[in-house]
Amino acid sequence: MSLLRSLRVFLVARTGSYPAGSLLRQSPQPRHTFYAGPRLSASASSKELLMKLRRKTGYSFVNCKKALETCGGDLKQAEIWLHKEAQKEGWSKAAKLQGRKTKEGLIGLLQEGNTTVLVEVNCETDFVSRNLKFQLLVQQVALGTMMHCQTLKDQPSAYSKGFLNSSELSGLPAGPDREGSLKDQLALAIGKLGENMILKRAAWVKVPSGFYVGSYVHGAMQSPSLHKLVLGKYGALVICETSEQKTNLEDVGRRLGQHVVGMAPLSVGSLDDEPGGEAETKMLSQPYLLDPSITLGQYVQPQGVSVVDFVRFECGEGEEAAETE
């Protein structure tokens, strides 16, 4: 080692510093990493956010991760972003699937207080009608219809009944926990399930004191998350007037609903109608479904109730009629 280099090494050992201009004092340049866009870290908290978003929205892990990356880890904004993207995809799919037959689906019946609603949502296959996501769509439509009815003014002395067609139903607000309209919820469901779907129709009834609504859904199953909502393929509401509150009114109402579903009357008729002829389509003069030896009127009379109106929905009945024409 040269004398000059030996002196430099000795100086560093004694003072801990380098002489000016020495190559030994130069340190490696810092390294930098650049990212083309936001990146979700692999930390435990990020994984927890990803799982939470996945559980809340039901979208794939890939899409949830992309949403969190796009929104910088903001859970609320990521959820909004996901819904917007899903809606875009849903509208695109809806346009492609428009015109395909929707003979399957579900009827939904929901009762709250003095208000009862009956809704029909159609899809292409029975397989999709049994899917949880489709059932949640029917639930949302029933809730949206119920909210609409609750904004209407009550009639103090008479019942009120109304119908909503597909266009009117689509324009209703989606509900307290959803943004946009029912049409937006429909687009989301189409995007997720990949079938053509239609918000077919809805009926609602509001009754004052002295009236009650009997109801029945055939092939009934409970909604996955709303115990008051009943789902099935046929549904009926029967509006009755009674002067006294009896304990068996609910059972009588269910039996009347069964009759309407099974016998498909076209009108109520009167107790004076004779059986046969045109009376066969009148509810009170039809043979009682559960005991054909008597008419429905003969069953009702001793129960202390008067049948004043009814609504009957059969899933896909409009589609079937169109095919036979």
Curated annotation (Swiss-Prot):
Q: Which PROSITE patterns match?
A: EF_TS_1, EF_TS_2
CDD domains named among the record's database cross-references: UBA_EF-Ts
Tissue specificity: Expressed in all tissues, with the highest levels of expression in skeletal muscle, liver and kidney.
Gene3D superfamilies the record matches? DNA helicase RuvA subunit, C-terminal domain, Elongation factor Ts, dimerisation domain
Stretches assigned to coiled coil: none
Q: Where in the cell is it found?
A: Mitochondrion
Transit sequence range: 1-45
Coarse class of the protein's main subcellular location? mitochondrion
Task: Give the record's keywords alphabetically.
Answer: Cardiomyopathy, Disease variant, Elongation factor, Mitochondrion, Phosphoprotein, Primary mitochondrial disease, Protein biosynthesis, Transit peptide
Where are the Phosphoserine residues found in this chain?
S270
CC terms in the record's Gene Ontology section: mitochondrion; nucleoplasm
Give one GO biological process term: regulation of mitochondrial translation
Answer whether the UniProt record assigns the keyword Mitochondrion to this protein.
yes
**Sequence positions bearing Phosphothreonine:** T324
The chain residues annotated with the modification N6-succinyllysine are: K76, K133, K192
One function term, GO molecular function aspect: RNA binding
- Its function? Associates with the EF-Tu.GDP complex and induces the exchange of GDP to GTP. It remains bound to the aminoacyl-tRNA.EF-Tu.GTP complex up to the GTP hydrolysis stage on the ribosome.
Q: Which PANTHER family match?
A: ELONGATION FACTOR TS, ELONGATION FACTOR TS, MITOCHONDRIAL
| Clinical note on disease | Combined oxidative phosphorylation deficiency 3: A mitochondrial disease resulting in severe metabolic acidosis with encephalomyopathy or with hypertrophic cardiomyopathy. Patients show a severe defect in mitochondrial translation leading to a failure to assemble adequate amounts of three of the oxidative phosphorylation complexes.
Please report which protein family the annotation says this sequence is part of.
Belongs to the EF-Ts family.
Q: What is this protein called?
A: Elongation factor Ts, mitochondrial
